[in-house]
């Protein structure tokens, strides 16, 4: 007779969960941040709000964003005037867009990741799909399974309405799946489309305006598995440890509510302060077991909620400016793509490390951290181990 302990041992992988491929995708419509205030106030019929436009222009100028990608074009917005009004009932129109576009954009990223992985898609055993853009049944995970032609018995996990911390959540879940299911290959997809949050400006709800200045559309996909097949699968990063915590006294700091007018966005002014106040504790918990206390000696992948968060984290930890370079580069080129952002930064870092002739995928360093920040205020922490290039 075989014991339960023996069965469990046989079911578990030997090595740590490893990122084996990364793919990203964006809608073709590229928006320049410098001219966006003009476009935004014109398309929402708000050009008479001169002072508010000046405020929005300052928000865009301070955002450290040069460009973003958006599914919503001028043509689509003209066809859907209710989406352009502030808080006009428009959920049906928004849903009709995102239930199609979210899985479609996710597929584009997934196809790239599967191609880099180099294995047949029939070897995918699990699918994690994450989006804050719309809700449907069967979900975006089901739609993606159909679009990619995955096997019907792939084990699916659908994560809706998590927000900006969820790039860390999907990694945490993928790690547990890969390490506890020998031979598992997990396709992870985060796909975010701002059609649910776009709306005209309001004098009384400036935090909504912050969202209009920051958010962009994008999808990122990973293949995650333990014990890579030699000569076939090429490791990029290993995931060594994960955690999730709710920051104390942070209720209401970041909220989103699905209403007839779409997904509304609410933000307290002191979000950067709450994040920077709690980051030290998260780092100690993560890196004390590794005897690491110099946070300039690790590589950094932080969700770029906005430049103020990055500035305060740098200041609090006395980080050198180059530590956040990959994060700031992605923010500059794409804006805040919610859950997909940190996965874009992973991709940016491994590519830049190779281009610069560095020894590892993590800017030549061995250890690194990935942070997700979002509603709650929830903080996700992932300790990464780089791979030799």
UniProtKB/Swiss-Prot annotation:
Active site per database record: 164
Molecular functions (GO terms): naringenin-chalcone synthase activity
The keyword Acyltransferase belongs to this UniProt entry's keyword annotation: yes
CDD domains: CHS_like
Disulfide feature: none
Reactions catalysed according to its record: (E)-4-coumaroyl-CoA + 3 malonyl-CoA + 3 H(+) = 2',4,4',6'-tetrahydroxychalcone + 3 CO2 + 4 CoA
Pfam families the UniProt entry points to: Chal_sti_synt_C, Chal_sti_synt_N
Superkingdom of the source species: Eukaryota
Root EC class: transferase
The keyword Acetylation is assigned to this record: no
Keywords tagged on the record: Acyltransferase, Flavonoid biosynthesis, Transferase
InterPro entries reported for this sequence: Chalcone/stilbene_synt_C, Chalcone/stilbene_synt_N, Chalcone/stilbene_synthase_AS, Polyketide_synthase_type-III, Thiolase-like
GO biological process, one term: polyketide biosynthetic process
Pathway it works in: Secondary metabolite biosynthesis; flavonoid biosynthesis
Enzyme Commission number: 2.3.1.74
PANTHER family reported in the protein's UniProt record: CHALCONE SYNTHASE 7, HYDROXYMETHYLGLUTARYL-COA SYNTHASE
Role: The primary product of this enzyme is 4,2',4',6'-tetrahydroxychalcone (also termed naringenin-chalcone or chalcone) which can under specific conditions spontaneously isomerize into naringenin.
Family: Belongs to the thiolase-like superfamily. Chalcone/stilbene synthases family.
Protein name as catalogued: Chalcone synthase 1
Organism: Trifolium subterraneum (Subterranean clover)
């Amino acid at each position: 007779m075989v014991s339960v302990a023996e069965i469990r041992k046989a079911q578990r992988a030997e090595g740590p969960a490893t990122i084996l491929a990364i793919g990203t995708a964006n809608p073709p419509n590229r928006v320049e941040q410098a001219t966006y205030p003009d476009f935004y106030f014109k398309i929402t019929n708000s050009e008479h709000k001169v002072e508010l436009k000046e405020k929005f222009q300052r928000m865009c100028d301070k955002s450290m964003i040069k460009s973003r990608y958006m599914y919503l074009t001028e043509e689509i917005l003209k066809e859907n005037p209710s989406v352009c009004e502030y808080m006009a009932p428009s959920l049906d129109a928004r849903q009709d867009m995102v239930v199609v576009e979210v899985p479609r954009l996710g597929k584009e990223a997934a196809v790239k990741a599967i191609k880099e992985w180099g294995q047949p898609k029939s070897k995918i055993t699990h699918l994690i799909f994450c989006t804050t853009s719309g809700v449907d049944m069967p979900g975006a995970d089901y739609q993606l399974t159909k679009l990619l032609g995955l096997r019907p018995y792939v084990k699916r996990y659908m994560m809706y309405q998590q927000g900006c911390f969820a790039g860390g959540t999907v990694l945490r879940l993928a790690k547990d799946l890969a390490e506890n299911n020998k031979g598992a290959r997990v396709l992870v997809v985060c796909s975010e489309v701002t059609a649910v949050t776009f709306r005209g400006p309001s004098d009384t709800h400036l935090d909504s305006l912050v969202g209009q200045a920051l958010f962009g559309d994008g999808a990122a996909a990973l293949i995650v598995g333990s014990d890579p097949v030699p000569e076939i699968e090429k490791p990029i990063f290993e995931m060594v440890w994960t955690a999730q915590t709710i920051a104390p006294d942070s209720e209401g700091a970041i909220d989103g509510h699905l209403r007839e007018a779409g997904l509304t966005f609410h933000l307290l002014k002191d979000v950067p302060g709450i994040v920077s106040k709690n980051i030290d504790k998260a780092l100690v918990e993560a890196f004390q077991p590794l005897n690491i206390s110099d946070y300039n000696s690790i590589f950094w992948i932080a969700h770029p909620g906005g430049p103020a968060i990055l500035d305060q984290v740098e200041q609090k930890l006395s980080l050198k400016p180059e530590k956040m370079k990959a994060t700031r580069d992605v923010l500059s080129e794409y804006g805040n793509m919610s859950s997909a952002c940190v996965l874009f930064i992973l991709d940016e870092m491994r590519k830049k490390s190779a281009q610069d002739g560095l020894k590892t995928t993590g800017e030549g360093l061995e250890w690194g951290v990935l942070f997700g920040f979002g509603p709650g205020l929830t903080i996700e922490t992932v300790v990464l181990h780089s791979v030799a290039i």
